[in-house]
Every structure is written in C-alpha cells, then in structure tokens.
Amino acid sequence: MQKKFEDCVKTMLEIIGENPNREGLIKTPNRVFKTYEFLTSGYTQNVKEILNDALFESSNNEMVLVRDIEFYSLCEHHLLPFFGRAHVAYIPNKKVVGLSKIPRLVEVFARRLQIQEQLTEQIAQALMENVDAKGVGVVIEARHMCVEMRGVQKANSTTTTSALRGIFLKNEKTREEFFSLINSAKQVRF
C-alpha cells in the first residue's frame, strides 16, 4: 500500500510539471505518505476503548466543560487542512470520564477526512453513547484552508458549528450556561 501511495505522489509531481527525482523532491513521496498516515490515524483508533477505560463512578451531576481543545483535520473535499478549537461539555449520569479522554476523542475524529459539521456531530454522539451522559454540547470554531487558500480566498474567516444532545438540546438554561461558559472563558487566560 505504501508503494502505491508513493507512486501516486510521484505521478502527481510529474503532472504539475515537477521532477520527482530532483534533490528536494526525491524523498517527498515517502514524507507525504508518513504525513497522511499520521493525519488519518483516527481510522485505526477505537472510541469505546479510549473512553471505557476511563469511566469513573461519581455523584457529580453538574456540567463538565473542556474548552479550547486545539485540533487540526483534513477537509474531505480538497484534502486541505482545517484547524481550530473544540469546546466539549457533558452532564454526567453517575459516571464521569477522565478529562484527558475528551481531547483524545476530538483527536480520533479530527484525524480522519472530515467536514466540520460531521466532526462536531461525531464527537457529540460518541460522548453521549459511550459515557451515557444526561446531555452533551459541542462547539467547534475553525479556519478552513480550502476557503482561505483557494476558491473565495477569504483569509481569517471562521466557521462555527454546534451539536447538542439530551438536556443541552431540551433545556434552555443548560444550553445558555454552556454557551455562556464558552464565551466568558475567552476573556480569561492563565
């Protein structure tokens, strides 16, 4: 599989008018393979294994928010990067998940070919199903290189998506608290 991938990169270089055998490009097919292997490593990771090993009994029934989780992903339409921050909250239902597992969950789905809308939904659904939370809220703010580098070429534009499940969707006060915590946190830095 690696050789086939590297041959495709060589062919692409030739098609755009480059010499894949020149000094600066000779190892490029291998570098590109390793890069894409890493950037798409989320396909080989199991969400249940990541989350189920870190569920702990708890009487906490208040919102848990992990904000400003930096991520990068690849747009499935152009294979160009998009990157930003995810804010993920849930309300426990007798169990809490280890805090480091929430950024790991974001990484699992971000390291796949994606669109932001789907990424947001997948994170929310995986947390809801695997943690049995009373509710989940996810907001992602991201910049897309397919928007900034090509097409409309609008630098620094940000796309915001949200996915709400359970009590976050049904209860206005919970939803307002979630959005308020995300927005107020933007002014506080340690």
From Swiss-Prot:
GO biological process, one term: tetrahydrofolate biosynthetic process
Catalyzed reactions per annotation: GTP + H2O = 7,8-dihydroneopterin 3'-triphosphate + formate + H(+)
GO MF annotation terms: GTP binding; GTP cyclohydrolase I activity; zinc ion binding
GO CC terms in record: cytoplasm
Keyword terms: GTP-binding, Hydrolase, Metal-binding, Nucleotide-binding, One-carbon metabolism, Zinc
Disulphide bonds in the chain: none
Pathway annotation from the record: Cofactor biosynthesis; 7,8-dihydroneopterin triphosphate biosynthesis; 7,8-dihydroneopterin triphosphate from GTP: step 1/1
Binding site for Zn(2+): 75, 78, 146
Family matches, as Gene3D superfamilies: 1.10.286.10, 3.30.1130.10
Enzyme nomenclature, EC number: 3.5.4.16
Pfam family, one: GTP_cyclohydroI
Subunit description: Toroid-shaped homodecamer, composed of two pentamers of five dimers.
Family: Belongs to the GTP cyclohydrolase I family.
HAMAP family on file: FolE (MF_00223)
Protein's name according to its UniProt entry: GTP cyclohydrolase 1
Origin organism lineage: Bacteria, Pseudomonadati, Campylobacterota, Epsilonproteobacteria, Campylobacterales
Gene expressing this chain: folE
